[in-house]
Amino acid sequence: AMYPDVKSTLLGEIARNDLDLALFHEHGVPERQYVTETPRANETDAYYYDAKYRMRQRIRTAVRRGKDAESVIEDIVKKYGITRDWVEDWNNPKTEAEDSLYDAATGIMLDDIAAAKPNVRMTIFDACYNGDFREDDCIASRYILSEGNALVGIGNSVNVLQDKSSSDLMGMLTEGYRVGEWMQQVNILESHILGDPTFHFTASEDAFRPDLHNTNCKYWLKFTSPKYPCDIRGLALHKLYALNYNDLSPLLLKTWKESDEYMLRLQCLHLLEHYNDGNYEKVLKDGVDDPYEFIRRKSA
């Protein structure tokens, strides 16, 4: 539960020394993680303030874009049926300072991270721009370069939320693969490792860790068996595609139909996109009613 509020709760979590992995699904810019729409509200007056704040912000944005403040105020008053006292202090320095603090409470900023001293070993930022290393500073860099035990971040340098599944083959990490080995299988141009690519979690004694350098299709076919973990099977399908295995399309369709594991079926969907034999169309029709929201979205 995000009590007492989202921002302070998350900052407390990333500071925990026993936290191995954090995965953020959020909006972002290089210097900010947008983690909540509104700060903590303890009373009904908080929502009254929020409504007025949003009206004032609308005026400020319009003025920055060259519009006349008075005409914008008149439009707002008319549209929402409010009185002028809701917004007439939009450019009052005291109100602007209060609104700035209110806005800051909705996101995690660079200085917030430095103060939190993150200890989470690995963080995945499924957000735009949080990993934009082209800037002088960015969220992902601040996690690993601040005091604390954070070692690696996976971040994006541009807009990617609609294009990327940040959980693809993540089970490889459970089996003891290094972060860099995992990212070699799933990386896209806009995603980056910031920190130590050799980092890995301790695997159990019965972990499965196939040789990523093996180029024999028969070797990888055995790992498509249901007796292996979901993402090892997904890795095997991925490697078979890379090795141009001739009978992969029917194997993908069969796996799609027989597996109830969402991430494995998502891997089948991704790979079948490369085949023009009718099987992709079959899974798309099934996918629009899939229990997994991301499969439904990709299918539509």
What feature does the model see in each segment?
Residues 1-5, 52-54, 153-161, 183-187, ...:
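A generic structural motif
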Residues 7, 30-43, 132-136, 162-166:
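Extracytoplasmic/secreted cell-surface and envelope-processing proteins
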Residues 49-165:
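Catalytic cores of nucleophile-dependent amide-cleaving enzymes
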